[in-house]
Amino acid sequence: MSVAFPSAFGASRHLAALLSLWIGLSVVPPSAATPLPKQPTKHAKTGKHTGAQKMGAKGHKGQRAQPHASKATPTDGYASRPDAMQWADEAATRMDLPADWVRQQIGQARRIPLIEQLVLPAPSPVAKNWAAYRSRFIEPRRIEAGAAFWQRHQATLAKAEQAYGVPASIIVGIIGVETLFGQHMGNFRILDALATLAFDFPQAHPRARERQAFFQGELDHFLRMAQRSGNDAQSYRGSYAGAMGLPQFMPSSWSHYAVDFDGDGRIDLFNSPADAIGSVANYFKAFQWKAGMPTHYPVTVTPGQTDMDTLLAPDILPTFSVESFTSKGAQLQGPALQHNGLLALIELRNGEAAPSYVAGTENFYAVTRYNWSSYYAMAVIELGQAVAERMGR
């Protein structure tokens, strides 16, 4: 749900953002964003809508390193753009919102050319490298911050696990990978980011029409959310793709999956860790998380003996029973042989070194619904496990 694209392999911040867009991995690295200014503290509950989507590709809101908004030079507002103002009028009718209010918000939104550059695919292929990507997130600073977060909110995490069946380690892993437990939530104005991508999505992108329509839908959801909350729509800040709060929810995800988990009558993913924890758990439940099922198992594959083409063809979608999986030459041991469900062979490339492999379950696939990337999913899982070990669990 996130859409802050993490930089996977270094280089300059700007280049890193473009590269991570290509690999499709979703996260804000520790050094990539300045601390977020005070966010709106009151968010009214919104009705459910169709599921949120995340920007990116398989392997993936890749995310992408989050650049400094202060380095972005905005152009004039969209008030002078007839196409944007026409869209505002249509949106007001479509969403039953005050037309003058919608026109005012869109008119004050500013185009950010930097964002247009950041969503373009990398100009040349870069080798995916799980070991390098992993090292950005499974590291002492993030593990210590995760242990502190878990310690402070262990009652809420336990409550979420009981209510939704999602382990604390997965919730902690998500929030840790997305925003370093709220330390880096992004500092772009959400209206600027979404308007830029809704009205000026770069046509050089191979999926420009689809992506532009997606962001116009996100702008719809954001305007509805902001208007119902009573907060200043111009005050919301987040990633350059429009993701918000500790869990980096896109507006449609906020509309559909965010919950008031602290019981104060409002949903606040910026300032309420309880709401963030409950919302992440609710998201996974909605995407068919199965309580008690592991996310993956160790697997051994042997070149020349394992039918790699068949096993890798479905990508990360669990497709094979244990019997079918092992009949194709993939070796499982112990509990994996008793797994009651489907499996996928997950390949994690390591640059020029040999790839790593795991047998992903339906719960591994559920993690990729938060961000469509096997690399992202493994980072979330392993960060959560590392924090749990630090906690002595």
Residue ranges of each PLM-predicted region?
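Sec-dependent N-terminal signal peptides
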Residues: S2-T34
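An acidic, Gly/Ser/Thr/Pro-rich helix-cap/linker signature
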Residues: L36-R152, A158-E161
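Glycine- and acidic
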Residues: A69-T73, F261-G265, E362-A366
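Surface-exposed patches in mature extracellular/periplasmic domains of secreted proteins
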Residues: L97-I106, P167-G173, A233-G238, D264-D268, ...
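Acidic helix-start/capping segments at beta-turn-to-alpha-helix junctions
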Residues: P98-V126, I175-T179, R189-T196, P298-T306
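Acidic/His-rich structured neighborhood in mature extracellular/periplasmic domains
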Residues: A127-S279, K285
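Ligand-binding pocket segment of bilobal, Venus flytrap-like solute-binding proteins
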Residues: R266-S321
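C-terminal soluble interaction/assembly domains
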Residues: V301-R393
